[in-house]
Amino acid sequence: MATMQISAKGLAPLRPRVSSRRVVKPVASGGGKTDITKVGLNSIEDPVVKQNLMGKSRFMNKKDWKDASGRKGKGYGVYRYEDKYGANVDGYSPIYTPDLWTESGDSYTLGTKGLIAWAGLVLVLLAVGVNLIISTSQLGA
């Protein structure tokens, strides 16, 4: 059993805490400028939707634009470093990329592996349910 030394006031003396965890510091790799034309949004015809998905605005790059509350913009655009790095996170990793979909992008088919996975999931859930019913009732006694 470990013993603790008691100081004059009845509390254990303070010692520096030693941690065995490593501190990991992320370092940016400087990947260069993102090419906005290769992210899968070229087939979108509506320019407003296309700019929204790319994280751009045709108005915010101008000095005289005003936001919804009436404050004057600074002319940096949506992403201040767009000219330097190419795109914001919306540009290099957009949520909706129809160019990268399959030929039948409007429909989703599971295929054989998907059906087997769903059947396995249903069987596992049924087995768990039957086990719970039997273990909590008089049927298991």
UniProtKB/Swiss-Prot annotation:
GO BP: photosynthesis
PTM annotation (Phosphothreonine): residues: T34, T37
Gene Ontology cellular-component terms listed: chloroplast thylakoid membrane; photosystem II oxygen evolving complex
Keyword Membrane: yes
Domain of life according to the entry: Eukaryota
Organism per entry: Chlamydomonas reinhardtii
Keywords, sorted A to Z: Chloroplast, Membrane, Phosphoprotein, Photosynthesis, Photosystem II, Plastid, Thylakoid, Transit peptide, Transmembrane, Transmembrane helix
Organism lineage: Eukaryota, Viridiplantae, Chlorophyta, core chlorophytes, Chlorophyceae
Pfam families (alphabetical): PsbR
InterPro entries: PSII_PsbR (IPR006814)
Transit peptide limits: 1-27
Topology with respect to the bilayer: Single-pass membrane protein
Record localization: Plastid, Chloroplast thylakoid membrane
Family indicated by similarity: Belongs to the psbR family.
Name of the protein in question: Photosystem II protein PSBR, chloroplastic
Function: Associated with the oxygen-evolving complex of photosystem II (PSII). Is required for the stable binding of LHCSR3 to PSII-LHCII supercomplexes and is essential for efficient energy-dependent quenching and the integrity of the PSII-LHCII-LHCSR3 supercomplex under continuous high light.
Modified residues (Phosphoserine): S43
Residue intervals passing through the bilayer: 114-134
